[in-house]
Structures are given as C-alpha cells and as structure tokens.
C-alpha cells in the first residue's frame, strides 16, 4: 500500500510538472508569419555538426557524466552505512533520507550562486567538495557507531551532488550556445552524460562482491573520487575557456 502511494505520488507530480511547463514556459518554436512557416536556418544535420564543433558542449557532456556518476553513487550510501558503520537498515535509510532532503535547497542555492558568480565556478567548487567527501570515505577507517561523522560527510557529499544537478544545463547559456541549437546540444550532452545509468551500479556490485564489507565500498569511493577529480579539472578548464572567450570579445 505504501509503494502504491509512492507510485501515485510520482505520477501526480510528473503530470503537474507537465501542465506547469505547458502554460508557464513560452512557446519559442518558429510560428507562421505571412502565411508561411519559418524554420531555423540550416538543416538538423548542420546543427548537429555545428554543435559537435563547440568545445564547451563536449566539456559540459563530461561534466554531466561525472556529476551523474556521483548521483548514481548516492544510492550506495545506505548500504555503506550498514556494511562499514554497523548501522541497521532503518537507521541507515533515515540518514540517507536526510541527505536526500537537501535536493531542493542545494539545487536552488547553487543556481542562485551560479547566477551571481558564474555556473562553471560553482560547478568546480561543488566537485571540489564532492572529491573531498569521496576521498574521506575511501581512505579513512570506518568507526562503528560513528553516526555523526557518517552523517556529516554524507551531507557534504549530498550538497555537492544536488548542487551540480541544479547547475550543469545552465552551462549552455554561459557558453553562449545559440538558442536555435539548444535542443541539439542538450541531446548530445544527455547521450554522453547519462551513460552512468548503464555502468555505475554494475561497477559498485562488482567491487563490493569482490571485497565484502568496508573494503569493497572504499574501492567504490575511489572510483567515485576519480570521476569527481575529472569533473573538477574539466570545470576549471571550461571556466578558463569561457573567461578567455569573454575577454576576446571585448
């Protein structure tokens, strides 16, 4: 019965979101004028080629990939709390739920800060905090019952993860991707960026099965740390690229 309520809750929220988008977001599709339908300059294939030639789009794809690896890794926190910190399943789920409630706060806060200090800089900062959080879990010895340490680090990691989810598509505007190519760019970025859906859970399962207990989880956090480091480097590189492009325009 509880699962039934959850499913209906997701369905209702999704439908309401669709209705909101339909009425709240203006229709920017080319409309008919003078009896003729206007279409964007160039064919779809030309848009694809043009988008593929924009370095910032590829960097954004890598950033999304690294951020989404972290998001999929969030699913491992509760099992880590049980296997490494000796918590029971109920308490572990409660701690992870606290981290999950940071989603709206972190995403909204990061978006506001991104508008003020630029998105790429906030992404780099988020990856930095995420890297520190992952490295802590990867290389420190878990202490059974140390709930405060566990919760504190989960909150740091969760804040970084959900902050990035409120930022990465805003890079399109910061990178000055032409509006007419936005859909194509989002498609390319998504194809690359959401591939962690395919492999992260598999990697986690292999590592934890090969090394049961805390060791397997620590290996998985090394895996997560690697992607956090890549995301940090690419974010900093993109920030420098955009700064250089902006300076060249003045």
PLM regions with names:
Residues 118-171:
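C-terminal transmembrane helical hairpin of 12-TM major facilitator-type secondary transporters
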Residues 19-24, 220-250:
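Multi-pass alpha-helical transporter architecture, strongest
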Residues 106-119, 208-209:
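Helix-to-loop junctions at the C-terminal end of transmembrane segments
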Residues 176-212:
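A late C-terminal transmembrane helix in Major Facilitator Superfamily
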Residues 1-25:
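Helix-loop-helix hairpin linking two adjacent transmembrane segments in secondary transporters
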Residues 27-60:
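Juxtamembrane intracellular "pre-TM" segments in multi-pass secondary transporters
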Residues 3, 87-96, 150, 182, ...:
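Juxtamembrane helix-start elements in MFS-like secondary transporters
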Residues 54-107, 165, 200-201:
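Extracytoplasmic gate region of multi-pass secondary transporters
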């Amino acid at each position: 019965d509880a699962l039934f309520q959850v499913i209906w809750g997701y369905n209702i929220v999704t439908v309401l979101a669709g209705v909101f988008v339909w009425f709240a977001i203006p229709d920017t599709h080319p409309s008919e004028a003078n009896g003729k339908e206007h279409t964007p300059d160039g064919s779809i294939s030309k848009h694809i080629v043009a988008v593929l030639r924009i370095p910032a789009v590829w960097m954004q794809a890598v950033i999304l990939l690294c951020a989404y690896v972290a998001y999929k890794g969030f699913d491992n926190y509760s099992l880590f709390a049980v296997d490494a910190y000796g918590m029971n399943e109920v308490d572990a789920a409660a701690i992870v739920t606290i981290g999950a409630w940071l989603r709206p706060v972190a995403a909204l806060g990061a978006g506001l800060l991104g508008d003020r200090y630029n998105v790429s800089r906030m992404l780099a900062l988020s990856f930095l905090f995420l890297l520190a959080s992952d490295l802590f879990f990867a290389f420190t010895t878990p202490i059974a019952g140390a709930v405060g340490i566990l919760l504190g680090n989960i909150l740091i990691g969760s804040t970084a993860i959900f902050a990035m989810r409120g930022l990465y598509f805003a890079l399109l505007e910061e990178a000055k991707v032409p509006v007419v190519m936005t859909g194509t760019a989002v498609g390319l970025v998504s194809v690359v960026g959401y591939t962690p859906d395919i492999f992260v859970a598999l990697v986690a399962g292999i590592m934890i099965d090969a090394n049961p207990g805390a060791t397997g989880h620590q290996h998985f956090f090394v895996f997560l740390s690697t992607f956090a480091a890549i995301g940090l480097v690419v974010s900093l590189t993109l920030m420098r690229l955009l700064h250089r492009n902006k300076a060249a325009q003045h």
